[in-house]
Amino acid sequence: MLESPVSLKYITPEEPNGWLSPSASKNTDWSEYYLNLEDPHWGFKSFNDFFTRAIRPEARPIDSRSNSIVHSSDSSPLHFSSEIYGKNPSFNVQPESQFWLKDNEYSVYDMFGAEEREVKDLVDEHFVGGTIYQAILCPWYYHRWHAPVSGTIIKSYRIGGKYFMLNPSCGLGGLHEGIENYVKSLPMLSMVSVRQVIIIRIDDGSGRLVALIEIGMTEVSSCCPTVEEGQYVNKGDQLGYFQYGGSSYALVFDKDLELEFNPNIYIPN
């Protein structure tokens, strides 16, 4: 249904319910996208066409410094200090943790679905003791993923999982509490939801790795890679996109990478 013209009912600039209306667009700069403003739906053919829209390259200039790592997607950081978002990026992550507990510890074996010997060996060698950064995409964000570093894709695979999960230690609660608990459940979702794992060997001769884990959330989100194993990507190249609904992603960094996070990041309400 979300691929059909029927789904365009609310993809209009009309108030009060149009996704393209001024009130709905206060967080979106439409000049960044390819649009046909003469069309009643601005050129979109379906809701999913709107959701997966491409962006103009000049709208997201890529940091060219060789020692920089960039965000994979338009997103809000999950691990910056506030009551809702919890703690800072997780360092020295463990191979296995009781991730359903309130501390929301990350378990890299579960994140990577490390059942195959090849994957488990990669996780043991590079990611146990490494660093995890997780972020969330809001519905109005740009929903394509891009390479955080330049390098060669050595693994790309999908893990089947669950949709619309909550950490059982949080509960549901009312509307505001329910949203807050859903955000608090996001670390757990990185280990139990449907997700796409892409592992990149950094092009610096060190052999170090960066993994991108794209996480499908809610009941209809899906992960669609556009790259293959063995492919070389430049920092900022497209890797894939989300369809239909809510999403999050995690960057997992090699234990031998020395990282400095930029605290000057805008966190929307």
Language-model features: locations:
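Contiguous, well-folded functional domains in the mature portion of proteins
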Residues: 1-269
